[in-house]
Amino acid sequence: MERATFAAGCFWGVEAAFSKVEGVISTKVGYTGGTLKDPTYKDVSTGSTGHAESIDIIFDESVITYGELLEVLWNTHDPTTKDSQGPDHGSQYRSAIFYHDDAQREAALRSREQLERSGKYDSTIKTEIVKASEFSPAEDYHQKYFQKLQFKR
């Protein structure tokens, strides 16, 4: 099993997208990229901790590659906006790839460059590619948020 960590706006929708991907074993939403140890949603929502709302993914590389997960990421959000996605604004909603090893870093850089050259977007890609730091899981009520909503209907 391998691990991938991405940020692409509000983590609820990102988790909903990745949880449907064949080869994804598990997803967990949380916070990464900041300075505060064990941040809460309230802490991160101030925009002052440096954390991004993110998703931590465990995947089976014999079923789906890291590169294929990057394609899902690019198609899940607008990577040309800085510190916002849709109605959500602030550095906690930034687009980022948090790599866990050199192979992931190289794959992310290649993938971002290919997307830039594709001409799909008129603006430059703003997605950060940074070394993964500690991932702090979000509160339970954030986990599988959209899945929980479906069961309440």
Curated annotation (Swiss-Prot):
Its EC number is 1.8.4.11. GO terms for molecular function: L-methionine:thioredoxin-disulfide S-oxidoreductase activity; peptide-methionine (S)-S-oxide reductase activity. It catalyses: L-methionyl-[protein] + [thioredoxin]-disulfide + H2O = L-methionyl-(S)-S-oxide-[protein] + [thioredoxin]-dithiol; [thioredoxin]-disulfide + L-methionine + H2O = L-methionine (S)-S-oxide + [thioredoxin]-dithiol. The keyword Oxidoreductase applies. It is an enzyme of class 1 (oxidoreductase). GO terms for biological process: protein modification process. The active site is at C10. Gene3D superfamilies: Peptide methionine sulphoxide reductase MsrA. Keywords: Oxidoreductase. It holds the Pfam family PMSR. InterPro entries: Met_Sox_Rdtase_MsrA_dom, Met_Sox_Rdtase_MsrA_sf. HAMAP family: MsrA. Has an important function as a repair enzyme for proteins that have been inactivated by oxidation. Catalyzes the reversible oxidation-reduction of methionine sulfoxide in proteins to methionine. Belongs to the MsrA Met sulfoxide reductase family. PANTHER family: PEPTIDE METHIONINE SULFOXIDE REDUCTASE, PEPTIDE METHIONINE SULFOXIDE REDUCTASE MSRA 2. This is Peptide methionine sulfoxide reductase MsrA. It comes from Methanococcoides burtonii (strain DSM 6242 / NBRC 107633 / OCM 468 / ACE-M). The gene is msrA.
